[in-house]
Curated annotation (Swiss-Prot):
Its EC number is 7.1.2.2. GO terms for molecular function: ATP binding; ATP hydrolysis activity; proton-transporting ATP synthase activity, rotational mechanism. The gene is atpD2. This is ATP synthase subunit beta 2. F-type ATPases have 2 components, CF(1) - the catalytic core - and CF(0) - the membrane proton channel. CF(1) has five subunits: alpha(3), beta(3), gamma(1), delta(1), epsilon(1). CF(0) has four main subunits: a(1), b(1), b'(1) and c(9-12). It is a peripheral membrane protein. It is found in: Cell inner membrane. One of its GO terms (cellular component) is proton-transporting ATP synthase complex. Keywords: ATP synthesis, ATP-binding, Cell inner membrane, Cell membrane, CF(1), Hydrogen ion transport, Ion transport, Membrane, Nucleotide-binding, Translocase, Transport. PANTHER family: ATP SYNTHASE, ATP SYNTHASE SUBUNIT BETA, MITOCHONDRIAL.
């Protein structure tokens, strides 16, 4: 973090330490402003950064530390920076892994002296600056492009419990979108495992997209203040590329729910009374502070894709419901589908997008998507009857619907590039036209007599045709 403070810094001293929260006393009449940065000196080479959150009295502030407070004691000196905490931005951070306060954490060289710094707190773009894009953001993932298309400059989130594939989807999207759009990617890892961050860094290096990517990590072992502000640090980097360098940016956040959890920890340490289900009373405003800054302006856009952990698979959870309200596309991951190895485990009925409109995606795409949904919904309605009585008890029309629904669900599975090491299957990126053609052929009955396995984990439908031809040849 650059020392971008005023020429004269106001000094004070610690009067109390409550875990990650510290109280600092300053001279009368020079109290730092809310959200201003505080540097707490200690014997170690790296000082502790904190952020002002409360004014307790005319001479005392309460601040949240963004680093480890172990070793601090009352009486230690502290300095107000005169500005909010700032993060490095621009080309200097591309290919680098930073912590929540913008310090390199990848054992690489120090950032160059010419690096530009920018405060992590900023206002959302004014309404007259916003640009309304209706350009579809193609991901190459069949089920998303068909049923929950993303918009360039919009916000999408993947909802799911633990272990259903959110992080794998995020990693695949980084790879495919950087290759397709040649833009900048900014990844915020909030409250996730160190192992996952290491794997992501290696994957980005191996795929050659790291030079166009900046990573910001606030890992699960770090203090809540660091996890709480890692998202704003990453967003500030993305805003600089959008506003100053006029680049289109892909902002990926894994995991927004961990940011909410960190905010809850901070809220408790600050002494605020919890609200519904124990969440912080500022839940809505904290989520909005992040989400409303993710926007498109004339000439450049920030497209955001976020992973959201759903506690106990409860989609009525207040934090999950609040995040839903800010999105253009919602991609819901199903534990049932994951248990059946139907990857990506995207629920075709629960997932939705405001972009799935005939005026935006075209009449053919809209009609095919609706037929796919209707067919799968009909199959799910019949599943209980099938379990009790068997498929033979269904009418011929219902049996045909079941047959096509099961083949559609298998066609919408897809191997990913980032999972080749685990599955041994080469990843596929599929154009929307190929996805629509494949679904249309299945709906029209072409695959009625094919083995379901022929459609499983493929890209385009032609692969299934080849499997069927090979199978027929082997049997003849």
């Amino acid at each position: 973090m650059a020392d971008a403070s005023h020429d004269t810094q106001v000094s004070g001293h610690l009067t109390a330490i409550h875990g990650s929260v510290v109280d600092v006393r300053f001279p009368q009449g020079v109290l730092p402003a809310l959200n201003e940065g505080i540097v707490i000196d200690r014997d170690e080479p790296t000082p502790v950064l904190a952020e002002v959150q409360q004014h307790l009295d005319p001479v005392t502030i309460r601040a949240v530390a963004l680093g480890n407070t172990a070793g601090l004691s009352r009486g230690v000196s502290a300095r107000a920076l005169g500005t909010p905490i700032q993060t490095p931005v621009g080309d200097a951070v591309l290919g680098r892994l930073l912590n929540a306060v913008g310090k390199p954490a990848d054992r690489g060289p120090e950032l160059p002296p010419s690096t530009v710094f920018r405060p992590i707190h900023a206002s959302a773009p004014a309404l007259n600056r916003l640009g309304a894009s209706q350009e579809i953001f193609h991901t190459g993932i069949k089920v998303i492009d068909l049923l929950a298309p993303l918009v360039k400059g919009g916000k999408a989130a993947m909802f799911g419990g633990a272990g259903v594939g959110k992080t794998v989807l995020i990693m695949e999207l980084i790879r495919t979108t950087v290759e397709r759009y040649s833009g900048i990617s900014v990844f915020a890892g909030i409250g996730e495992r160190s192992r996952e961050g290491h794997e992501l860094l290696l994957e980005l290096k191996q795929s050659g997209v790291l030079p166009r990517t900046a990573l910001v990590f606030g890992q699960m072992n770090e203090p809540p203040g660091a996890r709480w502000r890692a998202g704003l640090t990453a967003l500030t980097i993305a805003e600089h590329f959008r506003d100053v360098q006029h680049e289109n940016v892909l902002l990926l956040i894994d995991n927004v729910y961990r940011l909410v959890q960190a905010g809850g920890e901070v809220s408790g340490l600050l002494g605020r009374l919890p609200s519904r289900v124990g969440y912080q009373p500022t839940l809505a405003s904290e989520i909005a502070e992040l989400q409303e800054r993710i926007a498109s302006v004339a000439g450049a856009a920030i497209t955001s894709i976020q992973a959201v952990y759903v506690p106990a698979d409860d989609f009525t959870d207040p934090a999950v419901a609040e995040i839903f309200s800010h999105l253009d596309s919602s991609i819901v991951l199903s534990r049932q589908m994951a248990s059946e190895a139907m990857y990506p485990a995207v629920d075709p009925l629960a997932s939705s997008s405001t972009l799935l409109d005939a005026r935006l995606v075209g009449e053919g795409h809209y009609r095919t998507a609706q037929e796919v949904r209707k067919t799968i919904a009909h199959y799910r309605d019949l599943q209980e009857i099938i379990a009790l009585l068997g498929i033979e008890e269904l009418s011929a029309i219902d049996r045909q619907a079941v047959k096509r629904a099961r083949r559609l669900m298998r066609f919408l599975t897809q191997p990913f590039m980032v999972t080749v090491a685990f599955t041994g299957k080469e990843g596929r990126t599929v154009e929307v036209a190929d996805t629509l053609a494949g679904c249309r052929a299945i709906l029209d009955g072409e695959a009625d007599n094919w083995a379901e396995s022929s459609l499983y984990m493929i890209g385009v439908l032609e692969e299934a045709r080849e499997r069927e031809r090979a199978s027929a040849k082997a049997m003849s």
